[in-house]
């Protein structure tokens, strides 16, 4: 594709205002690909200079200019010495990267029904619910999220919740080639802030909830910045589906250009849950409710808690736009399973065990509070904390587990370059503020073995922190470690005794 065509497509984007100037060179140049990474540069590629926290793409221009068909620079950051290569200047090269990537890959976002989900919690589970429902109704659907990208039968492990814009459009293009008709993706506040999804007019944009998170020097400078970044999604979608019960919903919708629909438990929601009932049998935990409003049906979930009600309501609100079969919707919601998110693992007929990604105090408090509502014989929480991270997180998680769990099993997570025993001592500092009982078992497999071996009838055991991860990071090396495998090994060992 010629550079002139790419620039024309970028300038005509319906949701992004792209301004640029051609500093020098020939806009008839053929562009064969695009990158912002000098190591991935190939002949004929467009090179987009990104000024990041660690590296500045402008520093690599001399290395790549002989290969580039065009170099895109920030206004005032580069002085062209010769005009062998086209140079385009703009005030936002991240926006340029997003728009040009879409153009280079043939605008695949326009060939898919696009669903973008933002919010502090619930994004991952809801994306899988939506994908599973649509697939059950014969609508081939791609997924981009925290755990992985799914394109047909191909799964690619994720590095960021929302990938860089080049990867997004590359994945979209692969989805189109694979015959996908829709894509559901998690849209993080960082992804919105860094223009990774800029220029995409989502068919549906979704807001789940908002709580103070990701605020700090490397993410969002303030809660207001965090909220404003989330709100950007509703300036680039046709239909906005929002949580009617969240206190920040109206702020999120300020300046929105979309038609708005809502879901929730309160009376103001377009789709709401009524008559919520908890279900608990050994090895099984879930709930039922009546969905009323724009959709009327009985819902049964093999997932616990009010947040599961919200996640499923959100999925119902989204899939309603596809006119899905009600029985397929019911069956899919009943059996939906997300790796590492309240993932039930059958180990006994007497008690319940689950794996969950809760890796900070807020998430741990949420899952433990939810599980206490089921009145278990004992609530047992097994967790550790990551090394080379905030000590405050350790104190807070220790205190939360000490208050809410009947027994805390403190173990190792990803110690990184710290000693696991030192991390455990920090967690114990938090537990010491409570009257909670605890045992310390550094080896995670041995800790899981202890939990299963000492499980009592009616217990609920939570293995928290690792979730979908299949490794343990020690001294800079990621060793294979999947809790599902550890559980299987433990059960075989116990059977042999």
PLM region spans:
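Non-catalytic positions within long, well-ordered alpha-helices that form the structural scaffold/packing
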Residues: 61-66, 176, 198, 372
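Short glycine-rich anion-binding loops that position phosphate/pyrophosphate groups of nucleotides
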Residues: 52-54, 189-190, 211-214, 246-247, ...
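Acidic, Mg2+-coordinating active-site environments of NTP-dependent enzymes
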Residues: 66, 77-83, 178, 193, ...
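Phosphate-binding loop of NTP-binding sites
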Residues: 7-10, 95-240, 244, 248-259, ...
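N-terminal leader/targeting and accessory segments in enzymes
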Residues: 1-99, 235, 247, 269, ...
């Amino acid at each position: 594709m010629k550079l002139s065509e790419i620039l024309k497509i970028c300038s005509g984007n319906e949701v992004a205002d792209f301004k640029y100037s051609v500093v020098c060179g020939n806009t008839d140049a053929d562009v064969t690909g695009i990158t912002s990474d000098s190591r991935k540069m190939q002949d004929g590629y467009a090179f987009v200079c990104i000024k990041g926290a660690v590296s500045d793409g402008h520093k690599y221009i001399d290395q790549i200019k002989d290969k580039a068909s065009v170099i895109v620079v920030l206004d005032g950051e580069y002085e062209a010495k010769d005009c062998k290569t086209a140079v385009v200047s703009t005030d936002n090269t991240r926006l340029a990267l997003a728009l040009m990537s879409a153009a280079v890959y043939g605008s695949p976002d326009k060939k898919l029904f696009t669903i973008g989900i933002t919010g502090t919690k619930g994004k991952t589970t809801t994306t899988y619910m939506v994908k599973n429902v649509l697939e059950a109704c014969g609508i081939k659907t791609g997924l981009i999220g925290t755990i992985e990208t799914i394109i047909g039968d191909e799964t690619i492990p994720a590095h960021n919740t929302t990938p860089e814009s080049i990867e997004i459009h590359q994945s979209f293009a692969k989805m189109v080639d694979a015959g996908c008709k829709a894509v559901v993706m998690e849209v993080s506040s960082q992804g919105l802030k860094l223009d990774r999804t800029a220029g995409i007019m989502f068919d549906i944009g979704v807001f789940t909830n908002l709580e103070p998170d990701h605020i700090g020097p490397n993410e969002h400078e303030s809660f207001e910045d965090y909220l404003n970044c989330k709100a950007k999604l509703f300036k680039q979608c046709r239909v906005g589906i929002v949580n009617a019960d969240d206190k920040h919903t109206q702020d999120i919708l300020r300046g929105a250009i979309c038609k708005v629909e809502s879901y929730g438990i309160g009376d103001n929601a377009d789709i709401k849950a009524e008559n919520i009932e908890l279900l608990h049998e050994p090895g099984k935990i879930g709930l039922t409710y009546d969905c009323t409003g724009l959709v009327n049906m009985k819902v049964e979930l093999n997932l616990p808690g009010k947040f599961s009600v919200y996640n499923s309501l959100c999925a119902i609100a989204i899939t309603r736009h596809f006119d899905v079969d009600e029985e397929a919707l019911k069956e899919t919601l009943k059996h939906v399973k997300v790796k590492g998110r309240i993932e039930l693992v059958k180990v006994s007929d007497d008690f319940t065990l689950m794996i969950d990604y809760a890796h900070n105090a807020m998430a741990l408090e949420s899952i433990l509070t939810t599980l206490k509502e089921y009145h278990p014989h004992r609530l047992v929480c097994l967790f550790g904390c990551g090394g080379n991270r905030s000590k405050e997180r350790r104190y807070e998680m220790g205190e939360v587990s000490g208050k809410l769990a009947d027994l805390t099993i403190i173990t190792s997570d990803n110690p990184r370059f710290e000693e696991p025993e030192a991390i455990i001592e920090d967690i114990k500092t938090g537990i010491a503020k409570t009257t909670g009982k605890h045992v310390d078992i550094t080896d995670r497999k041995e800790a899981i073995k202890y939990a299963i071996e000492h499980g009592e009838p009616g217990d609920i055991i939570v293995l928290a922190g690792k979730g979908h991860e299949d490794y343990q990071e020690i001294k800079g090396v990621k060793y294979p470690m999947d809790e599902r495998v550890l559980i299987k090994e433990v059960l075989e060992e116990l059977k042999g005794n």
